[in-house]
Amino acid sequence: MASQPPPPPKPWETRRIPGTGPGPGPGPTFQSAELGPTLLTRPGQPTLTRVPPPILPRPSQQTGSGNLNTFRPAYSSFSSGYGAYGNSFYGSYSPYSYGYNGLGYNRLRIDDLPPSRFVQQAEESSRGAFQSIESIVHAFASVSMMMDATFSAVYNSFRAVLDVANHFSRLKIHFTKVFSAFALVRTIRYLYRRLQWMIGLRRGLENEDLWAESEGTVACLGAEDRAANSAKSWPIFLFFAVILGGPYLIWKLLSTHSDEVTDSTNWASGEDDHVVARAEYDFVAVSEEEISFRAGDMLNLALKEQQPRVRGWLLASLDGQTTGLIPANYVKILGKRRGRKTVESSRISKQQQSFTNTTLIKGATAADSLDDQEAAFESVFVETNKVPVASDSTGKNGDKQDL
């Protein structure tokens, strides 16, 4: 009879560390095959990795993302057109309605992979030049739009004046037709005046009435001619006034806007007050509205009044020049820091205050010394006055003695 194999060991008869080898056991192994054999881990303990928090919806996916144009201009500002000036001459023609996307190039390719580091560096280095070119093109396009809008406004005003004149001429025709119904009254009046002249009750008045009527007619014709000449020239003067004054106003507005933009971005370089934050996780930007950073980088954040109204995103700067949006849950706020301008102004004010106090002290000392000198001078003056008085009294006494 063949011998039977020994029965398998009972669970309490074998003692094995969980997760140390294959086979049935109370727990699986937690070591990943991708980490390799060089990674030292304790048996039965999981490998902990720091997972970044989820990113909130990006600014382009949120409503109201048009507020981002305050710090990142684009060509989409030309897509409004001239619908407000639509008329029979211009219609709804909009030469600036194509925008940037009409060229078949989409700068915000969210569905594609993020660009390489070389592309990002090239874009960062050439962004200033392209922004300058964009501002120049923006200025020329604004002037062209201004001239187009001016022509449309002048033409519409001219058409409105013509319509008003047409209505007045029609009203005059209607009143003429109404007054022609009273021709019988004028005929009776003429016969009555003729009868008075034949009887002798009215003499020489008819000629005077004719002369007065002729003078009134000539005066009316002269006024109408002057009004017609002035009406022909006012559109030309209005057009040239707008053409000459428009570029100056645009230049003033653009210069004011550039100054405001420069002042509003001084926080990025630390000139104005700003908020300091430290990056907790790595972040890679996928659009020009965002900036990339690594864990441990120090970021300058704009103040609350200058932050765009985008939920979960903050306006920040890494290098002091380029500004962009970063996720708020990827950074840790350290606190508010005063700008260099504020520190320098406070230091200058303190120096001026100390200098003023020193000047006051010196002035008080000089005033005291001046008072002492005046008192000494007055004492000497009093003594010199007393000496002649004494001599006079002596002389008088001598005279008295002589007498």
UniProtKB/Swiss-Prot annotation:
- Which loops or segments lie on the Peroxisomal matrix side of the membrane, by the record? 1-134, 193-233
**Ranges for domain SH3:** 272-336
Q: Which Gene3D superfamilies match?
A: SH3 Domains
Q: Which Pfam families match?
A: Peroxin-13_N, SH3_9
Sorted keywords for this record are: Membrane, Peroxisome, Phosphoprotein, Protein transport, SH3 domain, Translocation, Transmembrane, Transmembrane helix, Transport
- Residue ranges in the Cytoplasmic topological domain are 156-174, 255-403
Biased composition range(s): Polar residues: 59-69
Localization in the cell: Peroxisome membrane
Q: Provide the residue span(s) of the region labelled Interaction with PEX19.
A: 175-196
Topological category with respect to the lipid bilayer: Multi-pass membrane protein
Quote the biased-composition stretches of kind Pro residues, using this chain's numbering.
Answer: 1-11
The keyword Hydrolase appears for this protein: no
Recall the GO molecular function terms of this protein's record: protein transmembrane transporter activity
One GO process term, biological-process aspect:
protein import into peroxisome matrix, docking
Q: Which SMART domains match?
A: SH3
Q: Where is this region: Targeting to peroxisomes?
A: 145-233
What family does the database annotate? Answer: Belongs to the peroxin-13 family.
Per its database record, what is this protein's job? Answer: Component of the PEX13-PEX14 docking complex, a translocon channel that specifically mediates the import of peroxisomal cargo proteins bound to PEX5 receptor. The PEX13-PEX14 docking complex forms a large import pore which can be opened to a diameter of about 9 nm. Mechanistically, PEX5 receptor along with cargo proteins associates with the PEX14 subunit of the PEX13-PEX14 docking complex in the cytosol, leading to the insertion of the receptor into the organelle membrane with the concomitant translocation of the cargo into the peroxisome matrix.
**Subunit and partners:** Interacts (via SH3 domain) with PEX14 (via SH3-binding motif); forming the PEX13-PEX14 docking complex. Interacts with PEX19.
PANTHER family assigned: PEROXISOMAL MEMBRANE PROTEIN PEX13
Spell out the protein name for this chain: Peroxisomal membrane protein PEX13
